């Protein structure tokens, strides 16, 4: 919903159904090509994509970009929105916002979010989001596949290195992969870029602000 609110501010142009096929950079000129062979020219490029999509879009990534960004990996995760409480802990007094159910034999685990608590839902009916369930839930409302960043020593080192080349070739990078993989990390990385571009954000920063970025 926050995306709709941002769009409704009408502070910028945006394009839908315009899949990007290639991005070229030459002599401080940035050209974005879409699948319909339309070319858009810009002075500054901000990648607000998954990290593993960047190198596929850039026509000629720099040596630093290729070396750093290739360390970011992603995994596909199946998610269900449902009302099946059998994917929650057996005893309700142990339910929490995040619930892990493990399978020792398979060395895997299932994560179920209790949305009523996470989102403070005004209802007595319980709603859950389960990632990679060991059994398909009943009472399914919706299902989708998410791509989530995989964290490793290499990816954490790459976070710091990518922040050090922000602005090179008039190119910037933001996304949750620069923090801990949450929406808040994506927002904070975009705020960081806004400040590099001397653009203020429309809210005040708390005094004891916690920096989630590397």
Task: Indicate residue ranges for each PLM-predicted region.
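Conserved beta-strand termini and adjacent loop/short-helix elements that scaffold enzyme active sites
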Residues: 17-19, 35, 174
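Mid-domain catalytic core of redox enzymes
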Residues: 21-151
């Amino acid at each position: 919903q926050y995306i709709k609110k941002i769009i409704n501010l009408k502070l910028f142009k945006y394009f839908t159904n315009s899949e990007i096929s290639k991005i070229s950079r030459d002599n401080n000129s940035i050209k974005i090509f879409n699948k319909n062979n339309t070319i858009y020219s810009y002075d500054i490029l901000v990648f607000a994509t998954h990290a593993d999509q960047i190198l596929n879009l850039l026509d000629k990534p720099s040596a630093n970009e290729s070396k750093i960004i290739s360390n970011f990996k992603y995994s596909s995760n199946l998610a269900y929105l449902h009302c099946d409480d059998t994917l929650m802990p057996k005893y309700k007094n142990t339910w929490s916002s995040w619930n892990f159910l493990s399978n020792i034999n398979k060395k895997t685990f299932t994560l179920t979010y209790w949305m009523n608590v996470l989102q403070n839902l005004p209802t007595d009916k319980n709603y859950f989001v389960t990632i990679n369930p060991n059994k398909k839930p009943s009472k399914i409302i919706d299902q989708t596949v998410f791509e989530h960043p995989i964290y490793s020593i290499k990816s954490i080192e790459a976070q710091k290195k990518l922040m050090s080349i922000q602005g090179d070739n008039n190119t910037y990078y933001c996304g949750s992969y620069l923090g801990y993989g949450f929406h808040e990390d994506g927002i904070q990385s975009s705020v960081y870029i806004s400040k590099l571009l001397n653009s203020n954000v429309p809210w005040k920063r708390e005094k004891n602000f916690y920096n989630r970025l590397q």
